[in-house]
């Protein structure tokens, strides 16, 4: 029975996508809505059953559906593997996705492409479920590329907008960079392990760690190379510093898409992969150190950019980038359990933030927070939802973020990583930009046009009611994970799914009380600072002058996002364009001129010349015959004479 339920969890979103996608011209909005929401809700309920069976009772489900690849000794089956890690991911993905589907019925109600939109959302969910339930690297890669394709389709959903098309292409290309490294990592593993199955590869991890090769006079293990390549793939998918540039542009898609991408699907795939491959990464301390550094830098880097953004969705997008940095920092210090714990809690409160922001945008048709204000009385439910999501993000007790984020920072402190300081600084900035949104959108004097402000109201129930589930998740997921499942401990819920060779250090090291309370304390300080900065009109006008000042180089750097786009444009885009122009000129002026076009011109020229001999006069043709006879006789006479 449980095997059938497990299969249904994955196939129901696929069925929804196929029904709505293939019959998009024949199916009406109402029927499409019923199919999408009922199938996804059923999948979410089944995920609870599997969580009880596998997550709580520890019964692992391994289903071999059908043979896929068989070449000599290399064999890969199409399988479903569900352990504690997969079952908790099922909960996060299906429940957030079902809420997003229901919310979309109201948000996209006036859009002619709603059936196509629901189809893409369901397909996105299917690929993510396939990714987390794979038992081998090739099947994981299938899901990995699937979520990438769906993100392209959803970010560019409004394809008549040029900015949406450019954002979709940017996201697709940026992820291709990471995916290229990911493919090389998988190829390396298959080449040396002669298998793509997790079980076989993980057993060979110690051997791979001891297999050394010389690379530019530097001895490095095969495992280090494979893990580094896999992590670069994760950097692209999870928008870590360097490959993060696609994330803010992804806001061009409809807001429900942003919620699904940032909360439970695409960007969390990288964190999941590192956790799933903990059996490899634990034997590669060099790569773990690199992951810690990248995660720590990203969480502070993205939070600093979020401070200076004015677009409500982009602030939350950079918040996602920052929180993913926390998750990778946890994985880097071998606290994979804390990273996944934060992934799950983050899924609920980040989806709540995005969908609440969507309600605001739906009401006022504006995304610039400096043009809003005084909406708390017009939209009290949305205000309450956004406040709960923000406090959970900041890490205020007893909301979910308090337990999961503190777990990460305690692990970083216990491991002696300097990135702990980066995490604390990012926590302060998180509180400040969260309060920036709340104060400018819901408090103060309105800066909206009078007509827009007067007509601002709560969204319909189909948009508001589903958020109750996310509010509950933002409240209770942290408590359940901490008190009931012990997700913060390496020997807790995930002890059979994740490997931690240094678990004893985390178990015997107990950070002092002030370290445990420090994240919440700095969060409260950030809240106070944020309220002070964005409540006072005097301070606000000063901040606006600083942001617009041409002499304030620090704010210019933050507003321009550390000039990553400009840097890539200068180092990559422009040289490629110059090279393309050079090749284009060579193609047009040399290859085409002397190749196909030159040959065609020669034939045309010859045909024109021969055409001139066709005069239509008999005496001309007689002359040609006489000339031919004279030339022929002369030639033979010359041959005889010689």
Swiss-Prot record:
Q: Which reaction does it catalyse?
A: a quinone + NADH + 5 H(+)(in) = a quinol + NAD(+) + 4 H(+)(out)
The family database entries (InterPro entries) matched by this protein are listed as:
NADHpl_OxRdtase_5_subgr, ND/Mrp_TM, NU5C-like, Proton_antipo_N
Gene Ontology biological-process annotations: ATP synthesis coupled electron transport; electron transport coupled proton transport
**Which GO molecular function terms does the record list?**
NADH dehydrogenase (ubiquinone) activity; quinone binding
Its EC number is: 7.1.1.-
Gene3D superfamilies tied to this protein: 1.20.5.2700
> Would the keyword Transport be found if you checked this record's keyword annotation?
no
Pfam families to which the protein is assigned, alphabetical: Proton_antipo_M, Proton_antipo_N
Coiled coil regions in record: none
**Localization (cell):** Cell membrane
The EC class name is translocase
Q: How does it sit in the membrane?
A: Multi-pass membrane protein
Cellular component per GO?
plasma membrane
Q: Where are the transmembrane segments?
A: 4-24, 31-51, 88-108, 114-134, 137-157, 171-191, 213-233, 255-275, 287-307, 315-335, 340-360, 383-403, 418-438, 467-487, 513-533, 622-642
Sorted UniProt keywords:
Cell membrane, Membrane, NAD, Quinone, Translocase, Transmembrane, Transmembrane helix
Q: What is its main location?
A: membrane
Role of this protein: NDH-1 shuttles electrons from NADH, via FMN and iron-sulfur (Fe-S) centers, to quinones in the respiratory chain. Couples the redox reaction to proton translocation (for every two electrons transferred, four hydrogen ions are translocated across the cytoplasmic membrane), and thus conserves the redox energy in a proton gradient.
Q: Which family does it belong to?
A: Belongs to the complex I subunit 5 family.
Question: What is the protein named?
Answer: NADH-quinone oxidoreductase subunit L
Gene coding for it = nuoL
